Amino acid sequence: MTAFGVEPYGQPKYLEIAGKRMAYIDEGKGDAIVFQHGNPTSSYLWRNIMPHLEGLGRLVACDLIGMGASDKLSPSGPDRYSYGEQRDFLFALWDALDLGDHVVLVLHDWGSALGFDWANQHRDRVQGIAFMEAIVTPMTWADWPPAVRGVFQGFRSPQGEPMALEHNIFVERVLPGAILRQLSDEEMNHYRRPFVNGGEDRRPTLSWPRNLPIDGEPAEVVALVNEYRSWLEETDMPKLFINAEPGAIITGRIRDYVRSWPNQTEITVPGVHFVQEDSPEEIGAAIAQFVRRLRSAAGV
């Protein structure tokens, strides 16, 4: 039986980006292996996976702006924490961290959109991409199970503010509802900590679902996803697809589509959306094997 560690991995470090302090983990030496979380999580999501990669490179996990231990934006409001703003902060942090070449990306949720976008812009610097429950193509509402569809349609309506900013629905309901096991109070409190204060401190958890590329909106995110998708479906960049069973956002036609990507290895692990909380051992072992294979092929 898997033992689920509750302590964060590594020691938090901080860099100032555009006047805001951003938090990250940076452990070990060698070529970078970059773990990127999405909504509403933080680098804490990777705590039971990163240890599997020790000795295989420099392990980096960043907290997105307004999330984890990174600063909040001020003033805040409906126009803050868009995909573009999050990207600008994260890419500036990655630049400041000097990730070098031969980067391996490990991506989940919105971290996948950010990572796929960065990889598409830095194709010669990326050695391989591992991804799980990722944003691989624009979606339609028909792709969403009815029970979840209603909640996410709510986020994209005027009800989104009370749902997320007052009631903290994304952290209190969506997160635990997309994990097979029950998180301990200590684990939940790690995820709650950045969003303890009601109101605008919780804005990132609302801006993210409003940025999801669904039924053609928002147009700029749909265009971006189509741009990196067009590259991923033809590039021989090595890929590891960690398929979640039953999964949440890579299911049905989207799962069939992503299986068409070239030079891709696939494993299946138990999990809904936050698969790292259900299958860390399997995920960590698979990523370690993937990285060893990449390094071996490169003669490292």
Swiss-Prot record:
Top EC class for this record: hydrolase
Gene3D superfamilies cross-referenced by the UniProt entry: alpha/beta hydrolase
Active-site residues, Swiss-Prot/TrEMBL: 109, 133, 273
Annotated AB hydrolase-1 domain residues: 32-155
Reactions catalysed according to its record: 1-haloalkane + H2O = a halide anion + a primary alcohol + H(+)
EC number of this enzyme: 3.8.1.5
Keyword Acetylation (UniProt): yes
A biological-process GO annotation: halogenated hydrocarbon catabolic process
InterPro entries for this protein: AB_hydrolase_1 (IPR000073), AB_hydrolase_fold (IPR029058), Epox_hydrolase-like (IPR000639), Haloalkane_dehalogenase_2 (IPR023594)
Family: Belongs to the haloalkane dehalogenase family. Type 2 subfamily.
Quaternary structure, from the entry: Monomer.
HAMAP family registered for this protein in UniProt: Haloalk_dehal_type2
NCBIfam families hit by this protein: PRK03592.1
This protein's name: Haloalkane dehalogenase 3
